[in-house]
Swiss-Prot record:
The keyword tRNA processing does not apply. This is Ubiquitin-conjugating enzyme E2 D3. Its main location: membrane. Pfam families: UQ_con. Interacts with SCF (SKP1-CUL1-F-box protein) E3 ubiquitin ligase complex; when Cullin is neddylated, the interaction between the E2 and the SCF complex is strengthened. Interacts with DAPK3. Interacts with BRCA1; the DNA damage checkpoint promotes the association with BRCA1 after ionizing radiation. Interacts non-covalently with ubiquitin. Interacts with E3 ubiquitin-protein ligase CBLC. Interacts with UBTD1. Interacts with RIGI and RNF135; involved in RIGI ubiquitination and activation. The gene is UBE2D3. It catalyses: S-ubiquitinyl-[E1 ubiquitin-activating enzyme]-L-cysteine + [E2 ubiquitin-conjugating enzyme]-L-cysteine = [E1 ubiquitin-activating enzyme]-L-cysteine + S-ubiquitinyl-[E2 ubiquitin-conjugating enzyme]-L-cysteine; S-ubiquitinyl-[E1 ubiquitin-activating enzyme]-L-cysteine + [acceptor protein]-L-lysine = [E1 ubiquitin-activating enzyme]-L-cysteine + N(6)-monoubiquitinyl-[acceptor protein]-L-lysine. It comes from Homo sapiens (Human). GO terms for molecular function: ATP binding; ubiquitin conjugating enzyme activity; ubiquitin protein ligase activity; ubiquitin-protein transferase activity. The lineage of its organism: Eukaryota, Metazoa, Chordata, Craniata, Vertebrata. Phosphorylated by AURKB. Keywords: Apoptosis, ATP-binding, Cell membrane, Disulfide bond, DNA damage, DNA repair, Endosome, Membrane, Nucleotide-binding, Phosphoprotein, Transferase, Ubl conjugation pathway. Changing residue 85 to A: Loss of function. One of its GO terms (biological process) is protein K48-linked ubiquitination.
Length: 147
């Protein structure tokens, strides 16, 4: 079941890739993918290329994939291990969701962080109290780690 669904998503991605994103299997393991997200133009991550790993559980799509950044990023909802705080990867997962939709949700999270549900409270505090500083550090990290 999982493999059939993963193969379908792969062909859908090839046919209709989401803007600024790409994803596909690492080697022959269909349950382990690498994804790429281009830093959105209207964000301090503009110009950066961010890599993520995607691990599908054997009971996918009934359980969400594990998605994590491998490129370091300065963001209140993404910690230094690359873990992403995004409701659809946890409690709000639905089998109707696809990797394409997950990647687009992560892109929109880059444009619009959610400082009220942070993984990194200190970055959330800076985002809320000193947006210029947040944008400056985000741009510095993007130049340092994602270019």
């Amino acid at each position: 079941m999982a493999l059939k669904r993963i193969n379908k998503e792969l062909s859908d991605l090839a046919r209709d890739p989401p803007a600024q994103c790409s994803a596909g299997p690492v080697g022959d393991d269909m349950f382990h993918w690498q994804a790429t997200i281009m830093g959105p133009n209207d964000s301090p991550y503009q110009g950066g290329v961010f890599f993520l790993t995607i691990h599908f559980p054997t009971d996918y799509p009934f359980k969400p994939p594990k998605v994590a950044f491998t490129t370091r990023i300065y963001h209140p909802n993404i910690n230094s291990n690359g873990s992403i705080c995004l409701d659809i990867l946890r409690s709000q997962w639905s089998p109707a969701l696809t990797i394409s939709k997950v990647l687009l949700s992560i892109c929109s999270l880059l444009c619009d962080p959610n400082p009220d549900d942070p993984l990194v409270p200190e970055i959330a505090r800076i985002y809320k109290t000193d947006r210029d500083k947040y944008n400056r550090i985000s741009r510095e990290w993007t130049q340092k780690y994602a270019m």
